[in-house]
Amino acid sequence: MRVVEPQEGCALLLGRPLAERGLLLDCVWPVCNRWGAADVEQPWQGAGGRERNFLVDPREQLAAQRWGRDNQRSLLGVAHSHPAGEVRPSSADLRRSEPQRVMLILNGVGDVQSWWLGEDRRARPLPIHVL
């Protein structure tokens, strides 16, 4: 995701639930940031450029979900970068993200934090365990 700095980069997170142990994230699917692209519907106009916003291309998301179904994986959430910001979700991130998903944020100095977005659209820190 850092390759597109100073713009925000994004990726889809795929994996599967583990019985009583949380989620196994075993596929990071890089996608293009389509924020502001003329051929993609923009639900939030006037909110700035790709330096502070991202939008996953719906076609890329469908391709990832198809691959996931074929490989017993499901969409767990989205990763994106805050090149000049903190590793916590912005108010825009919280408004635009689907609830009951993982949100992983990487900043410009390499810090990473994962979050669980609940039904109430509040982000709660989610521990990461590397296997």
Regions found by a protein language model. Give the residues of each.
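Conserved beta-strand-loop surface patch within small alpha/beta domains used
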Residues: M1-L75, P83-L131
